Structure formats: C-alpha cells, structure tokens
C-alpha cells in the first residue's frame, strides 16, 4: 500500500502537533484521539488491525456500529457525533438530519480518485458530497454452468436468451432461479435488477438523484415507475417465480441450488466461493440484462459508505489523519480486507478491480456497466410488500407500484419511550480501560440469565447510555444488531475461567487478537487484571468480590460465539448450552422493555503498565 506508507512519516510528526476540538462519541480528552465507527464486527477484525498496522503511533479507536444512520442521529442529539461514520444501507434521504454536521468531500482531493459514476448519486442539490462509497461488491446471478452443459443449454447473453433458458429448465423440471424472496434485500434487488435498463436510463438517473436528496416526500415519475413495475412483473413471470417463492429464505434457496434442483441462484463473490466449495460443478456469474436493450449491468452495493464529522475541519492535523485512514481504506489492500477477499469492484481510478477469480462479468467491468443499488431504508420493506403482492396475485402491476410508493412516503409513527434512564454511562474507556455502558449492558444481561460471570468481546456494544427517556429502537442501537451473537451458558471451574480469559487476550480469533486497550474484552461478575506488553496484553489475575478466583470452585459463565469457541478449544468436552433463540441484542432489548433500570457498571478491568 504505497500511498499509505508515503503518508506515514508525515502523520507521525503531525500527530504531535494536534490541537483541536473533541468531536467523537465518548472520545478521550486527548486532542489526537480519532474515533471510527465500523458498521459490522467483520470490519473490526480485518480493516481495523490493518489500519493500526499502518499507523502504529496514531490514537485511533474503532467502535462497532450498526447498519443504520439513526445511530448517528442518536449521537448527534446528544452532542457526541463520532469523527468517522460508516453504514452499508444508505440513502441521502435517510441522513437528512445529519447533513449540517457532516463534512463536504467535494473540495478534497479524495473525490478525484473516484470514477464519476461512483459519486453520481452522492451529490446533494448544492453539489456537496457528504458520503463516499468504499469499494463495490457485485450481487449478480450465479449459474451452475455444469448443469447448463449437461442439458445442452447455452448460458444467456441478453434478456431474450435469459427467458429462453428459464423456459428450457422449467420444461425439464428444474427450477430456473431459486431466489430467497422471503428476505427483504432480495425483493429490493429483484425490482432494480429486473428493470435495470430503466434505472440506468436518463429518466432513472434523474429520479434517483432527486430521490437521494429529497428532504420531504419522494416524487415519483409515474411513466417511469409504471415501466419499472411492468418489467418487474415480467421478470417474475419469465423466471417462473410463484407464490411459493414468498417463503423461500436464504437457506432454502441455497440448498436448492447446491442440490442441483435449481439452475441459478444469486449472491456475492464470497457466496459463490462457499457454494463452489459445496458443489462438484463449475459456477459462473451472469449479469442482469436490460429488457429494453442488449445492455447488461453488474448490480452491486458498496461494502460501506463513509462520512466525516464536520468538526474535523477545525483541526487540520486530525483531519489529515482521518483522510489518511480513508486513503488506507480505498487502497488495494484496504479494499480487499473490507470486501473480505476477491470479487471487489474498485470505485477508484488508481486501484484495479479485483475480479480475476469471478468469471462472467468481464465485459461489464471493462465497460463500467455498473449499477449501484438504491438502498433507502424504507425501500427494503416497500420492495418486499410490492413483490410479494405480485407473487401472491393480490396485486397487479399498478397496485404494486402504488403500494411501493405509499410505503416509501409513509410517515414514521412517533415511537413511545420504553425506559427512562436515570443514569448516564459512557461507551468510551474510563481511567481503568473499562467501558461503563458496555459493563452496564452485559451485567444486566448476566443477571437476567442468572449467570455468575460473563465474558464477551468489546465489539458488541455501540453506544453510551444517555440519561432520559429512550425508545425500544434506540435501546436496540446500543448493541451491534447487525453483528449479533447467540448467548451460551456453561459451568466451569475457576482454573478454566482463568485459562479462558488468558487465551482471549492472546488468541481470541485466528484473524484477530487484542493489541490495543480499545480491544480489551468486557467482563461481568469478575475483575480481570492485565499487564500491558509491547505487542498486547497478558493476564495477571482474576478476582471476584476482591478475592482471587477460586480455581476449584464451579462458576456459571455467560458466553458469546467468540468466547464459546475459545472455551471449546481449551475444553472440547465441556457441555455448553445455548440460551434458546436469545441473542445479546434481544436480551438487552427484552430487559429494558418493561422500563426497569439497567444494572450499574462494574469495576471489571484494570491495566497495569
């Protein structure tokens, strides 16, 4: 990553001069502290360590977020907007309230590194660019090429041939396309992919630009949208989808494809690789075809969208650090990590697309025939309602369009508060390197499940607990809903508890381990005392009620996926019980649903030099 390395020397010296204004949620009082919110914990395990590696002398804290701009609206309401924010599902419409608080990228050099089509939908009516996409993930049809060859069926190269292919497989008793239409994102995909020629037309681009910047009701071009729903309906018929497909979830659709009961599925490059590992067949990707021309397009979405707090512009050195973090993300290696491997469409002119192992899309990539999905939050539910209406026969094309339009412009009902928090706890590190908000949440969940101890990674807790009334949806934003984890209970002795914590600090995950104070685990019911080493931390002691843990005594301990997997390595035969369908997020929401106060934070960690 040559560009990032070039900046490193300048950054190290610049950080010593930083003076400015604290801008992040729960940030430390040091002026050079930069807070970066990443929308899922996969990013905490790959891109965060990589950035730390590039900038070892920078004080950069990564905190888990959610795939919802409302999290940042919540922070903004309490005057604690982070320095850097990310989401995947994004539309300018969803972030209107944040607009006055976000930095405009338009005047910065970073925009010149993007292809024009990549920022086309990110400009507001004033020409400002407050969000930028970070690399693209193709979401296209995955075809079983071996099955095509077995039946002498040609892989389609245009929409007419696609229709013929579907009919040929249907006539042979094989489902042409098993799509998981029980999922909202697939219904959203099917509308935009079926009418991709309309969405990429001048009329479609014009509507999209207006919709992305609409501060109120989204205006619909009836002529355009009648065509869109006509083509959506036609695609459903041509693909031989029926009302039974309404209940096909991701697992069912995948299994049909793996077993050769369907000829086509859909997904990302990582999905294709997983399918390839399960199948003795050659797979190939097929783009989505326009119904109005011979054009074809790669339907894709950014791995993440990123925004900067406007306050960064008041501190040039800190802004330079933030821009270098962004530059690190859009480097070739950064994009590979963010996109989780191969199959990355670079949106940047100086980084090549990494599609060598993803056959079938060569011409579209070469011609930049790429469509970035429209992903306003309401469009997911609106798409599901409309497509299910068409499939069930309860709606014709016009009724489906009207339902979609109504859902997109529906008014959000005012949500009632479910709890009035009497105390405020910060998600930032306290003077002992603990997080009071995370401690409060975990202790509440532990006590609700009658466990004596609990140990979880730090990357399940997103927000401070703010004093005052709070709705259920905002309570839910305090934990990482988009990176949720089941909860487990197990009884082990004190020696095994000690070994569990020790292993967590050194080898929590083959791709992730604790290197900075920001990555230390969250514990409850016990206090872990750790020593700060040059390349991480080591466990010195564990106390319970100010006494050393009894190595022979049995304790019930609450675990998550990560801590459970570590325990399994230590003691493969231990009986670990999953707590039904309960997740960390659902347990927290349920605990607060009756208006009770959360448990007070515990003094659960101490770091010795």
Task: Describe each region flagged by the PLM.
Residues 277-340:
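Extracytoplasmic/periplasmic substrate-recognition and gating elements
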